[in-house]
């Protein structure tokens, strides 16, 4: 996922690499690439009734106007340092923040992550359990433009008592 993110970048204001519900282990991270190519983790499970993507909305107490003022202030500080110092880290963080701003301000991204927008019958067809809702959200994100989506769903890799294990799940 990180290689895809590095080579192709984001599309339609969506992160290039997304992990549902979270990054499962260090092998799903950015490896030797910059952390800016690491996956975007939802921070919540789409199978939960109160599912909400962790960092998709503005924090409580921050409206659009306050958000814009903060962004302008950060831009001024970054401009000051980048013109007076050799600040590669400022440039790198600036691109990271730009992607975050694009995600937060994109209605299309919010719709893609909002599994409640999906038809109830379709949600039922996928199954209202971890596997079904994670797969459904992955499909929505790919259709909206995410380049690489991975999801975690454990408990199916059985080595003993396979028949009974599958019946139980």
What is each of the regions a protein language model found here?
Residues 1-169:
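Ligand-binding pockets and gating/stacking loops
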């Amino acid at each position: 996922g990180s290689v895809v993110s590095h080579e192709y970048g984001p599309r339609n204001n969506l992160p290039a690499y997304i992990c549902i519900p979270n990054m499962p282990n260090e092998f799903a991270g950015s490896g030797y690439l910059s952390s800016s190519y690491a996956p975007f983790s939802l921070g919540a499970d789409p199978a939960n009734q109160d599912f909400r993507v962790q960092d998709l909305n503005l924090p409580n107490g921050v409206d659009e106007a306050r958000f814009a003022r903060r962004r302008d202030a950060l831009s001024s500080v970054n401009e000051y340092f980048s013109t007076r110092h050799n600040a590669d880290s400022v440039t790198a963080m600036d691109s990271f923040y730009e992607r975050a701003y694009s995600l937060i301000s994109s209605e299309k991204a919010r719709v893609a992550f909002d599994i409640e927008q999906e038809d109830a019958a379709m949600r039922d067809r996928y199954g209202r359990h971890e596997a079904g809702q994670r797969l459904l959200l992955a499909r929505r994100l790919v259709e909206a433009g995410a380049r690489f989506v991975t999801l975690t769903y454990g408990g199916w890799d059985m080595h003993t008592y396979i028949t009974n294990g599958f019946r139980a799940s």
